[in-house]
């Protein structure tokens, strides 16, 4: 198991719990820490964390971002890329992060505020593939942030908190500090229920994806060629929600995974039966062309390095470092 460790209470609680369970499951635990270089003391903190891990007999790999950007979405992409590479090199079958039920509730509220579709609102899953051989696991989704704090204190684990988690410039931090406390005051237990809703949406999404694949197969211009185009008239005869879901899924399969919900709505308007042929640029440089009979992609769009799931539609601008 490759554990992503920031030094905060969630990831330290994760290390403590999995270390205690190691004797039962005989896991090989490897720690990974990413230094974004955002703070003058980040290298010192990384060194202190490395010293603690060595004292505990836990191997830790340090990675420093060579071209840091003060954008959480870019940082998150860098972390996932490095974690995938490290997992493959070390032979780890799972990357494990310390996301909690509190993170899930915050993500749901963020996606609701953005007008995200259901896929985004159920984005933090227990388990999902990163590539053909490595899965991403989030075993702490059953715990709230206050509970991971109790675990950290009970196990007497050290902390290296990240001040950026309190920076009000990030949307997630303001939801954590300002929005959720109001919801908890109005409806005690709101965070836990929001997390449960996100979990149910994720479960429903997995079943829905199977149905979407069957429906898309019927809409292909060439049944044996998923890149041969989509039947425009058949697509636009469907109910609006089904049109939206199937077009989004098809575009993802063509490589355009970063199309926003607003862009999707504008595209559907252009595909109405009374509108003529046209074309539209896709994220990443590809182009979508349509005649009165079919839709066709040329050049592809973005080729995402991970399956759609956590942040591709749209990306979460501030998912804390795991």
Please tell me what each predicted stretch does.
Residues 1-181:
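Core alpha/beta nucleotide-donor-binding catalytic domains of modification enzymes
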Residues 71, 190-193, 260:
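Residue-level recognition of alpha-helical structural elements
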Residues 76, 84, 149, 195, ...:
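Generic structural signal for individual residues within well-ordered alpha-helical segments
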Residues 104, 174, 178, 196, ...:
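Amphipathic alpha-helical interaction segments
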Residues 183-208, 214, 231-246, 250-251:
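An accessory alpha-helical subdomain
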Residues 213-224:
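Conserved Class I S-adenosyl-L-methionine
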Residues 223-321:
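Mid-to-C-terminal catalytic/tRNA-binding core of tRNA(Ile)-lysidine synthase
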């Amino acid at each position: 198991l490759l554990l992503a460790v920031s030094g905060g209470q969630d990831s330290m609680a994760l290390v403590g719990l999995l270390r205690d369970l190691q004797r039962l499951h005989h896991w090989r635990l490897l720690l990974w820490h990413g230094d974004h270089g955002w703070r003058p003391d980040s290298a010192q903190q990384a060194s202190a964390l490395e010293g603690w891990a060595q004292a505990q007999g836990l191997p830790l790999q340090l990675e420093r971002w060579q071209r840091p950007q003060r954008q959480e979405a870019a940082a998150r992409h860098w972390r996932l890329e490095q974690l995938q590479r490290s997992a493959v090199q070390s032979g780890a079958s799972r990357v494990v992060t310390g996301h909690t039920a509190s993170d899930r509730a915050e993500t749901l509220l963020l996606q609701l505020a953005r007008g995200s579709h259901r896929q985004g609102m159920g984005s933090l899953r227990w388990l999902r593939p990163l590539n053909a051989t490595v899965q991403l696991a989030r075993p702490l989704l059953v715990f709230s942030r206050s509970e991971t704090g109790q675990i950290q204190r009970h196990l007497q684990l050290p902390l290296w908190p990240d001040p950026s988690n309190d920076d009000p410039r990030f949307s997630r931090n303001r939801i954590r500090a300002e929005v959720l406390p109001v919801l908890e005051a109005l409806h005690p237990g709101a965070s836990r229920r929001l997390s449960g809703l996100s979990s149910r949406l994720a479960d429903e999404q997995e079943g829905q994806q199977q149905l979407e694949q069957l429906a898309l197969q019927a809409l292909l211009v060439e049944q044996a060629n998923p890149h041969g185009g989509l039947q425009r008239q058949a697509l636009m005869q469907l109910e609006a929600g089904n049109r939206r879901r199937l077009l989004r899924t098809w575009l993802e399969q063509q490589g355009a995974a970063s199309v926003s919900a607003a862009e999707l709505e504008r595209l559907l308007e252009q595909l109405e039966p009374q509108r003529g042929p046209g074309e539209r640029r896709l994220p990443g440089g590809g182009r979508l062309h349509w005649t009165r009979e079919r839709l066709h992609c040329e050049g592809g769009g973005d080729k995402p390095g991970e399956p759609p799931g956590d942040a591709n539609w749209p990306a979460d601008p501030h998912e804390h470092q795991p």
